[in-house]
C-alpha cells in the first residue's frame, strides 16, 4: 500500500490517525479499536466492513 495515503486517510468515525498493519493488511484506528481491511491494495473505509479489535490487538500498533 502507498504510504502517502496514510497522510490523508483518517478514521471515518472519529477522524483519528490510522496505523498500517502490513501483516494483516488493515488500517487500525486505535481510538475506536477498529481495523479497516485493505483489499487488492485499496483501503475499505466503510464502518460496516471494519473489524472490532481487542485492547491487546490494538496495543500491537504502537
Curated annotation (Swiss-Prot):
> Could you read off the lineage of the organism from its UniProt record?
Bacteria, Pseudomonadati, Pseudomonadota, Gammaproteobacteria, Thiotrichales
Q: List the disulfide bonds.
A: none
InterPro entries named in the record = Trm112-like
Looking at the record's lineage, which domain of life comes first?
Bacteria
| GO cellular component terms listed in the entry, alphabetical order | cytosol
Q: Record's PANTHER family?
A: PROTEIN PREY, MITOCHONDRIAL, ZGC:162634
Task: Please list every transmembrane segment annotated in the UniProt record, as residue ranges.
Answer: none
Q: What is this protein called?
A: UPF0434 protein FTM_0733
A Pfam match: Trm112p
Give the species this sequence originates from. Answer: Francisella tularensis subsp. mediasiatica (strain FSC147)
What protein family is recorded?
Answer: Belongs to the UPF0434 family.
Q: Known Gene3D superfamilies for this protein?
A: 2.20.25.10
Amino acid at each position: 500500500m502507498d504510504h502517502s495515503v496514510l497522510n490523508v486517510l483518517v478514521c471515518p468515525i472519529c477522524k483519528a490517525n490510522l496505523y498500517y498493519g502490513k501483516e494483516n493488511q488493515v488500517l487500525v484506528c486505535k481510538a475506536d479499536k477498529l481495523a479497516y481491511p485493505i483489499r487488492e491494495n485499496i483501503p475499505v473505509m466503510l464502518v460496516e466492513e471494519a473489524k472490532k479489535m481487542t485492547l491487546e490487538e490494538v496495543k500491537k500498533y504502537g
